[in-house]
Swiss-Prot record:
ATP binds at G607, P608, N609, M610, S611, G612, K613, S614. It comes from the Bacteria. Belongs to the DNA mismatch repair MutS family. One of its GO terms (molecular function) is ATP binding. GO terms for biological process: mismatch repair. This is DNA mismatch repair protein MutS. One of its GO terms (cellular component) is cytosol. It comes from Lactobacillus delbrueckii subsp. bulgaricus (strain ATCC BAA-365 / Lb-18). Gene3D superfamilies: 1.10.1420.10, DNA repair protein MutS, domain I, MutS, connector domain, P-loop containing nucleotide triphosphate hydrolases. Keywords: ATP-binding, DNA damage, DNA repair, DNA-binding, Nucleotide-binding. InterPro entries: DNA_mismatch_repair_MutS, DNA_mismatch_repair_MutS-lik_N, DNA_mismatch_repair_MutS/MSH, DNA_mismatch_repair_MutS_C, DNA_mismatch_repair_MutS_clamp, DNA_mismatch_repair_MutS_core, DNA_mismatch_repair_MutS_N, DNA_mismatch_repair_MutS_sf.
Length: 856
């Protein structure tokens, strides 16, 4: 938009806007933040603001919109959630004291990855900013949640691993030093990831050396430096809460591609994108926001270290065995606020009095938690409690300084306790004395004038005034009262005596308010020195919260403590799918065993659609993940290997981010397993080959099975509708056939949902089609067509291993096909609800049907 003729203020605006062309500029004017030009037009649409104009009388009025400064966070968050950046331009001096144009400057650039303000729905969500640097030998990747100050860093060899990490983390913004192709940029944007250029800062900054202190890898150092520089450049303040970067190897954890996590629905439903329907939804019995976020982190990075897994199990077992200790901890955790994010707000300088008091209350609750743990009588719980520092002195200093129920704002007074400051107490005494004097004056003036409804009031424009109703104006003493304001029903006056005391009262109020803010700022700075200790405490309480949640899950859902095998064997007794079990009526889920000894690497699973093959496969993966995060698992007993990787090909959804077809995605995911799986991996393949022609698909599926068997040796569950593949057990020694049972009763298909040995020996595809509601005419035509095709292309196969056709004609062949009219009549009969008919109506219907058949 071309620039209009400007005033000095607008000239200042344009100079600042030129520095942030890709951001919305929120420009502070008095009590509002204003947007101009294109920002105003676009912002008014997104934020549903009224679009008006500045300089309406000029030939070229400037589009303008505004938001109140008290509500700015919500508007900024709305823009940031949609992927935009927002530059906050503040008045840097008191407009009343400014000489000429008020100085303004950018105090913060809010971006999708640097959002500090979190709504109630975001409490369990981490908001990651990720930094990626490319060097010879690979990529350094560092990510941080600014609201908590945590920083993690790793390095990978291949760009595909970078993209997988970005998608798995669900990072909101990536700072990328390098050339990003248009297709890659588009893919990230489709995943709601904002791509930003690195920032630059002159000189050295203490935060950089502090967070890098444990790093030795140059690539990781570069990634962390780029991350911290971007944070400092955008936030424009000291970031004392940034934590020492924690370096990790991807191989330290069970590796799962983003697609695997999505297929298994670890943290969100694949259907809705929401928490409900995910494994996180089932397991999340956490009490604190910190615990919820940590549980999510654990789900995305299950452990490989058996020692660490067992340490977690020990804590869960101890809490499971002691109901009263567990319940006391839960009660105390309810009094713990989000220490991690409160610490971030302290460092940021925007913590308010209520939040500081929340911090103190959290520390008081921590003392109760420590007492409960130490007195539990369990060595593991006692040791955990002894390792927690309750920060008692800090809690005491906060509660001794702040009133019990402070206001949110620190600038309006009423936040500091009496006795904290002698000067403050004197100002308050003067204020109270002045207010008593005002009350006394009001009473005396009523007596002097005879005006019973005379009252003394105050506003910021006129200060203190005497208000008299219109009906009593004649009684006003004109020699002492000076009219100041006329209202519809009243007149307002001042007197020399009133103005004299007003100055004394307002001066005391002003000094009191200023001193309270000064004392609060001193308290905030004192708390800032404790940030590292508060962050450590937050981590300890978050982990305890997750342990308690796991113990509650185990008790309420009858989960068992899994054991681990070094012999690469699986023995799950009566295993259940945790999410499916949670949504079904209590006791209705049908459990299944899964036993694979050392000599068995592949189970080939056959059975009709909808019978539960996919559920059975996912069930094993979820049990393995739960076991490796330290949780108990849904089974009567479970012995598992420690898996190093999980690969899946489950579901028929296209890759929304890459634009690949279903078959290409299928082959890509299969290739991931073939290239990278080891004998310690878990592979789940569901209906590989269905995305292409039948014989192509069957050949590919068979070759993939043979490769997994001969070259990889991973524990594999392979579901297929190609029944010919079941003959592979004759040549592949480590492959066994299993199937999902089903039976037919009175012409109806009954899914048994039980896993049985051997291949399925009968097709129920036509029954499934019936369950789906396909018209009889379609089913009949499909059966006839399939019968002809089989007759034309029949080939000899083992009679005991007949082709398991999806639409088998055996069950539906009709010697005398029905006429169309008869078919319609049968459909009408099948749809009648006899329970809603009277006997007479039923008799009439039967008579009508008989007549119709006679006519045909």
């Amino acid at each position: 938009m071309p620039r209009k003729a400007t005033t000095p203020m607008m000239e200042q605006y344009y100079q600042i806007k030129d520095q942030y062309p890709d951001a919305f500029l929120f420009y502070r004017v008095g009590d509002f933040y204003e947007l101009y030009e294109d920002d105003a037009i676009k912002g008014s649409q997104i934020l549903e603001l009224t679009l008006t104009h500045r300089s309406n009388k000029s030939e070229n009025p400037i589009p303008m919109a505004g938001v109140p400064h008290m509500a700015v966070d919500s508007y900024v968050n709305t823009l940031v959630e949609k992927g935009y950046k927002v530059a906050i331009c503040e008045q840097l001096e008191d407009p009343k004291k400014a000489k000429g144009m008020v100085k303004r400057g950018i105090i913060q650039l809010v971006t999708p990855g640097t959002k500090m303000a979190q709504g109630p729905d975001d409490s369990q969500e981490s908001n990651y900013l990720t930094s990626v640097v490319e060097k010879a030998g690979g990529y350094g990747l560092a990510y941080s949640d600014l609201s908590t100050g945590e920083i993690f860093v790793t390095h990978v060899k291949h760009y595909a691993e970078v993209v997988n990490e970005l998608l798995s983390l669900r990072t909101r913004e990536v700072v990328f030093a390098g050339n990003l192709s248009a297709s890659d940029r588009d893919r990230l944007q489709k995943a709601n990831i904002t791509v930003s250029e690195p920032a630059e800062l002159e000189g050295e900054h203490a935060e950089i050396s502090y967070v890098q202190q444990k790093l030795t890898d140059s690539m990781e150092k570069a990634a962390v430096r780029q991350l911290v520089v971007y944070l400092l450049a955008t936030q424009k303040r000291s970031l004392a809460h940034l934590q020492v970067a924690e370096s990790f190897e991807i191989g330290q954890y069970l590796q799962m591609a983003n697609t695997v996590q999505r297929n298994l629905e670890l943290t969100q439903s694949a259907t809705t994108g929401r928490k409900q329907g995910s494994l996180f939804w089932v397991l999340d019995k956490t009490t604190t926001a910190m615990g919820g976020r940590l549980l999510k982190q654990w789900l995305s990075r299950p452990l490989l270290s058996l020692d660490r897994i067992k340490q977690r199990q020990q804590m869960v077992q101890a809490l499971l065995d002691d109901y009263f200790t567990r319940e006391n901890i839960v009660d105390s955790l309810k009094g713990v606020y989000d220490l991690e994010r409160l610490s971030g707000r302290v460092a940021f300088g925007n913590v308010n009095p209520r939040e500081l008091l929340q911090l103190a209350k959290s520390l008081e609750a921590t003392k109760l938690i420590i007492q409960t743990l130490v007195e539990s009588g369990n060595p593991d719980l006692e040791k955990y409690g002894q390792g927690i520092d309750p920060q008692s002195e800090l809690a005491e200093s906060i509660t001794n300084c702040l009133v019990d129920q402070p206001p949110i704002s620190a600038k309006d007074g009423g936040i500091i306790r009496a006795g904290v400051s002698e000067d403050l107490d004197k100002y308050r005494e003067a204020m109270n004395g002045g207010k008593k004097w005002l009350a006394q004056m009001e009473m005396e003036e009523r007596q002097r004038t005879g005006i019973d409804n005379l009252k003394i009031g105050y506003n910021r424009v006129f200060g203190y005034f005497i208000q008299v109703s219109k009906g009593n104006v004649a009684k006003v003493p004109q020699d002492r009262y000076t009219r100041k304001q006329t209202l519809t029903n009243a007149e307002r006056y001042i007197t020399p005596e009133l103005k004299e005391h007003e100055n004394l009262i307002l001066e005391a109020e002003s000094r009191s308010t200023d001193l309270e803010y000064e004392l609060f700022s001193q308290l905030r700075e004192a708390v800032k020195a404790h940030i590292p200790d508060l962050q450590e405490l937050g981590r300890q309480l978050a982990a305890l919260d997750v342990f308690v949640a796991f113990a509650q899950d185990a008790e309420e859902k009858n989960y068992c403590r899994p054991s681990f095998s070094s012999k690469n064997e699986i023995a799950v007794k009566n295993g259940r799918h945790p999410v499916v079990e949670a949504v079904l009526p209590a006791g209705s889920y049908i459990p299944n065993d899964l036993v694979m000894d050392e000599d068995t690497s592949i189970y080939l699973i056959t059975g009709p659609n909808m019978s539960g093959k996919s559920t059975y496969m996912r069930q094993l993966a979820l049990i393995a993940i739960m076991a490796q995060i330290g949780s108990f698992v849904p089974a009567d007993s479970a012995k598992l290997p420690v898996f190093d990787q999980i690969f899946t090909r489950i579901g028929a959804a296209d890759d929304l981010y890459s634009g690949k077809s279903t078959f290409m995605v299928e082959m890509s995911e299969a290739n991931e397993a073939l290239q990278h799986a080891s004998s310690r991996s878990l592979v789940l393949f569901d209906e590989i080959g269905r995305g292409t022609a039948t014989y192509d698909g069957m050949a590919l599926a068979g070759a993939i099975i043979k490769y997994l068997h001969d070259k990889v040796g991973a524990k594999t569950l392979f579901a297929t509708h190609y029944h010919e593949l079941t003959e592979l057990d004759e040549t592949l020694l480590h492959l066994k056939n299993i199937h999902v049972g089903a039976t037919e009763e009175n012409g109806k298909l009954i899914f048994l949902h039980k896993i049985l040995p051997g291949p399925a020996d009968q097709s129920y595809g036509i029954h499934v089609a019936k369950l789906a509601g396909l018209p009889r005419a379609v089913l009949r035509e499909a059966s006839s067509m399939l019968k002809r095709l089989e007759a034309e292309g029949a080939r000899e196969i083992n009679p005991s291993r007949q082709q398991l056709d999806l639409f088998s004609p055996v069950e539906v062949v009709e010697e005398n096909p029905l006429k169309a009219e008869q078919e319609e009549l049968l459909d009408e009969i099948s749809q009648v609800n006899l329970n809603e008919k009277t006997p007479l109506e039923v008799m009439q219907l039967v008579a009508d049907w008989q007549q119709a058949l006679k006519e045909e």
